[in-house]
Amino acid sequence: MNISLKGAIFSTVGRFNLPKVQGFIRWNSTMKSQQPTLFSEVASLSSTFKNSLSRAGFEKMTPVQQRVLNEVFPNEENAVVQAKTGTGKTLAFLLVAFKDVLKGKPRLNSSKIHSVILSPTRELALQIFEEARKLTYGTGIRVSYAIGGNSKMREENAIRRGNANLLIATPGRLEDHLQNPRILESLSTDSFILDEADRLMDMGFAESILNIHEAVTTTKTRKLCFSATMPPKVSNVFRGILGTDFKLINCLDPNEPPTHERVPQFVIETKLDKVFSSSLSLLQQLTSSNPSSRIIVFLPTISMVDFVGGVLENHLKIPCFILHSGLTTAQRRSITESFRKCQSGILFATDVVARGMDFPNITQVVQITGPSNTDDYIHRIGRTGRAGKTGEAYLILLEQEKPFLNSIKHLPLKRATIEPLSDQALSTLRSDIEKSSKFSRTNALKTLYGSKPHVFSGSSQRRATGKNIHESAIALFSLHDVPGLMEELIYKSRGRGSPKGFRGSQLKYPSSSSSSFQRRPRSLPSRGRYQQSRR
């Protein structure tokens, strides 16, 4: 593989420390040696689920499963569990949910929902749903989901007809459903579980979660919160949900460095008009050196994922997949499952897979252009080097994005160079770009501008070279023949929208794509208020 390293430009400094959480009970990460380590040894786990776990190939518990099943599962305690993704926490909280659903066998014949699990993204919710469906086969438990991008009416009908004892949902969609009093009446929640709580907070769902909690839980509801990190904004929500009476279980190994400190990381600097050729050269070299490569490629926008993935897959010899929030739920499920099962492949994606999604054996993560912030960078590279496996991370960085390196100078990052494409390969790539529709190229370019105002802004330092930046961007997408595009990009970069009366290529372009949006939380009726209104 012809990727040369020019020596470490950054080195690890110190250790990432979680902020202390005021008012929380002392961390306790000590494993009790007398705790069972096999599912078959857990006395409080029913034979039904022991058989289901055995059929699914689960025998030995991971540390987080061991802690939850021995310390939380037998009791009715509320708990906060700090654990990284990829440690088996999904199975741990599903078994708790199953137990709460099965408190009384006759309840399976009722039309009530007895357990609610909230997930930050559709992809993660579907992943939890698939795992739950496999484990509940033959148990009588009915599992359903409520997520955006799906038919709301179909979900409502499934809930009202009693097709769910366990509901897995995203906050926005569940808020929509809870505006319907009949849906609220279907809830008799014995357990309320938050997965990836820190990401739920990052996505602006704090108030929504508190509203949902007030609407669907009672004082008898068991509450579990799972989170990889514990920043103050997360602990504040936990207090609102759990109060002060809960168990805190820390499953982080204090001796294990975080993924972003131990995974080898490389930065490849490139000119704007050479981003695609540099990306293709890197991917070709990675896959040729390891035919079993499983790579996730992150891009900043939906349109960029569609365009870059669509062009580059013609030049790569292993299966390629595209995943983002613009696809239907059925498409996303199919793509996720296909990539998870393939022996080798490349997944082009937005940040919908940066956290929570568990794809096994990812050999490399590649970021094409810099992320929005340090947290995004860290979460992206966290997709590789999981479960004791090795991995690598590559960052293809624009010259104008060099200041970003200052924010990750504490990480083990090295500078690398790659062999340029041959003249013939470069000509073929350029031809494929030109064969793409002007609409897809122009829309990808515009969303790239929207995602990187710091690169394309018309600040005083850049005005002298600003035109060169826009020319490079147009050259990248082979769009020199779009009338007025240069003028529009210059106006956009200065925060002025489009020139008055400008019609450009006279194509109608959709507004800038975004992989997620934040909804304004709505006030939901609490269970008590709803019951009073019914009277």
Swiss-Prot record:
SUPFAM superfamilies, per database record: P-loop containing nucleoside triphosphate hydrolases (SSF52540)
Family: Belongs to the DEAD box helicase family. DDX18/HAS1 subfamily.
Function: ATP-dependent RNA helicase required for mitochondrial splicing of group I and II introns. Also required for efficient mitochondrial translation.
Region Disordered: start-end pairs: 495-535
EC number(s) given by UniProt: 3.6.4.13
Record's keyword terms, sorted: ATP-binding, Helicase, Hydrolase, Mitochondrion, mRNA processing, mRNA splicing, Nucleotide-binding, RNA-binding, Transit peptide, Translation regulation
InterPro entries: DEAD/DEAH_box_helicase_dom (IPR011545), DEAD_box_RNA_helicase (IPR050079), Helicase_ATP-bd (IPR014001), Helicase_C-like (IPR001650), P-loop_NTPase (IPR027417), RNA-helicase_DEAD-box_CS (IPR000629)
Protein name: ATP-dependent RNA helicase mss116, mitochondrial
Domain Helicase C-terminal: 262-429
Enzyme class: hydrolase
Entry GO MF terms: ATP binding; ATP hydrolysis activity; RNA binding; RNA helicase activity
Localization: Mitochondrion matrix
Main location: mitochondrion
Catalytic activity: ATP + H2O = ADP + phosphate + H(+)
A GO biological process held by the record: mitochondrial mRNA processing
Annotated organism of origin: Schizosaccharomyces pombe (strain 972 / ATCC 24843) (Fission yeast)
UniProt cross-references to PROSITE patterns, sorted A to Z: DEAD_ATP_HELICASE, HELICASE_ATP_BIND_1, HELICASE_CTER, Q_MOTIF
Residue range covered by the transit peptide: 1-27
KW Hydrolase (keyword) present: yes
Entry keyword Transit peptide: yes
Q motif (motif): residue ranges: 38-66
Biased composition (Low complexity): 510-527
UniProt GO cellular component terms: mitochondrial matrix; mitochondrion
Gene3D superfamilies hit by this protein: P-loop containing nucleotide triphosphate hydrolases
